[in-house]
């Protein structure tokens, strides 16, 4: 395919047009009075959203050179979303500001490489200053504030803070669609896996169709149990203790299952059998997790263990187990806390080294089940369009909250960027590097300007007053008042703020140092086929 090539100013200006188109579309959503953007979908109703990364991903421009500029900014939003889960609009605004100021200087004859070095030094100083002013987040109220600011809903803030309190920082919090119109929180404490009882005759509550086992023994094996004789010595030992039994096995079939059911119905023995969760290597890992949580041993050939030789000491224990037709929940396993902590540490290191998003997600689920539990926020809304928009907001809020717990918080509303201006201005640089520093100084003001503009205020006036205000004071764009940002609950996670700045500077620097752009030439339209004269009939 033939290529179209542009050089120097032509190349950069074409890319900048793309940057501006995308950034101008995204930045209208910034702040408490930001507007929505409507995205056409191939199927179904349009998506109405104020989520920066969702909007950025949808934008495709006809001009190849402009589209490359737009895609680079979209990459900033995506990268910020991957790292911090929020702050994508802020990152887009910062990118546009750095590119706009940088292009002016490059066009005037400044060296782009020197400018890039200055930008990198200024950003490193700004990030360091942001981290120094960070306030740790630990209590429920602070978590609720972070989530409320991100989602623009105090109710959502309460749900997320309650969920994090219940399941801990390592717990899994999932977002699902509710069948009703109300948004609600459902928390499952303990370890849950998606396997239910093998026979409905094993239930203890026939009205709710669940089996509740109090203080049970737990047999964990990756073998199939077909012959009751294999586990008969073990069953006789448990029978003497008068305690119930949960069997987690590859399967229970043959004559073993009806024998267990018959003893359950007769009241001889309270037993529930479920299939082991997962498949392949993941199943082995999950069975080992259950064993460590309950203080038991996995009966497996890998360890040279056989069912007929298993003793009561190899069984796990828990304070309660609840089994329904689809899932099993183990509450308060009797495992050694030190062994559980070691297992958690191993899974955390596996998460860090995992390259696949799917693997990371599954490891995160295992971590949550070992360390806390699972919380589900069920989102309700009047229409499907509203439901989609609300789900995106809650996902952003959840990510922002996790980021806040991880690295702390700073003043929100773009105030944190302005608060580090003095630290960046104090950086002693010369020549083009000083120009790079000055570009960052101007860009750091841009989020506040845009938030003020979206709320109907003059950005320059707000910036001037903010620079002369005492530390911690900022502009509440929602009310038009000047307040202490932290006390007013207008806060941003440090991780979100620094990621937005670092990613924006990285991609903007690449655009400024671009000297040639290569794009595919558009395919010429194929000519329409000539009409066959024989088909013209009596037209002549």
UniProtKB/Swiss-Prot annotation:
InterPro entries (alphabetical): Chaperonin_Cpn60_CS (IPR018370), Cpn60/GroEL (IPR001844), Cpn60/GroEL/TCP-1 (IPR002423), GroEL-like_apical_dom_sf (IPR027409), GROEL-like_equatorial_sf (IPR027413), TCP-1-like_intermed_sf (IPR027410)
Biological role: Together with its co-chaperonin GroES, plays an essential role in assisting protein folding. The GroEL-GroES system forms a nano-cage that allows encapsulation of the non-native substrate proteins and provides a physical environment optimized to promote and accelerate protein folding.
Compartments reported by the entry: Cytoplasm
GO cellular component: cytoplasm
Name of the protein this chain belongs to: Chaperonin GroEL
Principal EC category: isomerase
Organism in which the protein naturally occurs: Streptococcus gordonii
Complex formation: Forms a cylinder of 14 subunits composed of two heptameric rings stacked back-to-back. Interacts with the co-chaperonin GroES.
Example GO biological process: protein refolding
SUPFAM superfamilies: GroEL apical domain-like (SSF52029), GroEL equatorial domain-like (SSF48592), GroEL-intermediate domain like (SSF54849)
């Amino acid at each position: 395919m033939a290529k179209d090539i542009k050089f120097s100013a032509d190349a950069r200006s074409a890319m900048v047009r793309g940057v501006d188109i995308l950034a101008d579309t995204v930045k209208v959503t910034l702040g408490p009075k930001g507007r929505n953007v409507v995205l056409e979908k191939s199927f179904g109703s349009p998506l109405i959203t104020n989520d920066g990364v969702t909007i950025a991903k949808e934008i495709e421009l006809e001009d190849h050179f402009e589209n490359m500029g737009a895609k680079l900014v979209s990459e900033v939003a995506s990268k910020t979303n991957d790292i911090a889960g929020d702050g994508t609009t802020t990152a887009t605004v910062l990118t546009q500001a750095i590119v706009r100021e940088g292009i002016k200087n490059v066009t005037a004859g400044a060296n782009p490489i020197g400018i890039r070095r200055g930008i990198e030094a200024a950003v490193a100083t700004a990030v360091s200053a942001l981290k120094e002013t960070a306030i740790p987040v630990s209590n429920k109220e602070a978590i609720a504030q972070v989530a409320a600011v991100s989602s623009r809903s105090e109710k959502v803030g309460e749900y997320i803070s309650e969920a994090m309190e219940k399941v801990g920082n390592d717990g899994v919090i999932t977002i699902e669609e509710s069948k009703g119109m109300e948004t609600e929180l459902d928390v499952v404490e303990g370890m849950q896996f998606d396997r239910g009882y093998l026979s409905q005759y094993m239930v203890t509550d026939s009205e709710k169709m669940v089996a509740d086992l109090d203080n049970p023994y737990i047999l964990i094996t990756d073998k199939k149990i077909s012959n009751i004789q294999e586990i008969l010595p073990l069953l006789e030992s448990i029978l003497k203790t008068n305690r119930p039994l949960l069997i987690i096995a590859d399967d229970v079939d043959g004559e073993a299952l009806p024998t267990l059911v018959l003893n359950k119905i007769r009241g001889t023995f309270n037993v529930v059998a479920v299939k082991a969760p997962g498949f392949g290597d993941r199943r082995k890992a999950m069975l080992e997790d259950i064993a460590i949580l309950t203080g038991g041993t996995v009966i497996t050939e890998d360890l040279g263990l056989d069912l007929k030789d298993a003793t009561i000491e190899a069984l796990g224990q828990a304070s309660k187990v609840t089994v329904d037709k689809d899932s099993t929940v183990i509450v308060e396993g009797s495992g050694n806390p030190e062994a559980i902590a070691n297992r958690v540490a191993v899974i955390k290191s596996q998460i860090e080294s995992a390259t696949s998003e799917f693997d990371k997600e599954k490891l995160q689920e295992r971590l949550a089940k070992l360390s806390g539990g699972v919380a589900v926020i069920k989102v309700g809304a009047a229409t499907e369009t509203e439901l989609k928009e609300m789900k995106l907001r809650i996902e952003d809020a959840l990510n922002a909250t996790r980021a806040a717990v991880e690295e702390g918080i700073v003043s929100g509303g773009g105030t944190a960027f302005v608060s580090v201006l003095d630290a960046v201005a104090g950086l002693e640089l010369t020549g083009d590097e000083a120009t790079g520093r000055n570009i960052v100084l101007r860009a750091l003001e841009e989020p506040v300007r845009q938030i003020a503009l979206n709320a109907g205020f003059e950005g320059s006036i707000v910036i001037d007053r903010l620079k002369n205000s005492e530390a911690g004071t900022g502009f509440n764009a929602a009310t038009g008042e000047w307040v202490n940002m932290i006390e007013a609950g207008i806060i941003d996670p440090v991780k979100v703020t620094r990621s937005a700045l670092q990613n924006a500077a990285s991609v903007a620097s690449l655009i400024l140092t671009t000297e040639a752009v290569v794009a595919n030439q558009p395919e010429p339209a194929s000519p329409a086929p000539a009409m066959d004269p024989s088909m013209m009939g009596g037209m002549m």
